Amino acid sequence: MASSTDVRPKITLACEVCKHRNYITKKNRRNDPDRLELKKFCPNCGTHQSHRESK
């Protein structure tokens, strides 16, 4: 089972505009200790928006 100290945990990316959680991905905690922020397409907004890691 996955532990809380997993090196590559699953994270969800939420749109900064509409706050919908649209994407699930993995990240490497050693390379990206801060919250991940990517520009992805938001199907709810219909445009490319900034998506940020949410809990």
UniProtKB/Swiss-Prot annotation:
The similarity annotation says: Belongs to the bacterial ribosomal protein bL33 family.
Q: Which InterPro entries match?
A: Ribosomal_bL33 (IPR001705), Ribosomal_bL33_CS (IPR018264), Ribosomal_bL33_sf (IPR038584), Ribosomal_zn-bd (IPR011332)
Record flagged with keyword Transport: no
Q: Which Gene3D superfamilies match?
A: Ribosomal protein L33
PANTHER family registered for this protein in UniProt:
50S RIBOSOMAL PROTEIN L33, CHLOROPLASTIC, LARGE RIBOSOMAL SUBUNIT PROTEIN BL33C
Annotated HAMAP family: Ribosomal_bL33 (MF_00294)
- Which biological process terms from the Gene Ontology are attached to this UniProt entry? translation
Entries under Pfam families matching the protein = Ribosomal_L33 (PF00471)
Taxonomically, the superkingdom here is: Bacteria
A Gene Ontology molecular function term of the record? structural constituent of ribosome
Per UniProt, the keywords (alphabetical) are: Ribonucleoprotein, Ribosomal protein
Q: Which gene encodes it?
A: rpmG1
Keyword Amino-acid biosynthesis tagged: no
Q: What is this protein called?
A: Large ribosomal subunit protein bL33A
Q: Which SUPFAM superfamilies match?
A: Zn-binding ribosomal proteins (SSF57829)
Species of provenance: Rhodococcus jostii (strain RHA1)
The GO cellular component terms are: cytoplasm; ribonucleoprotein complex; ribosome
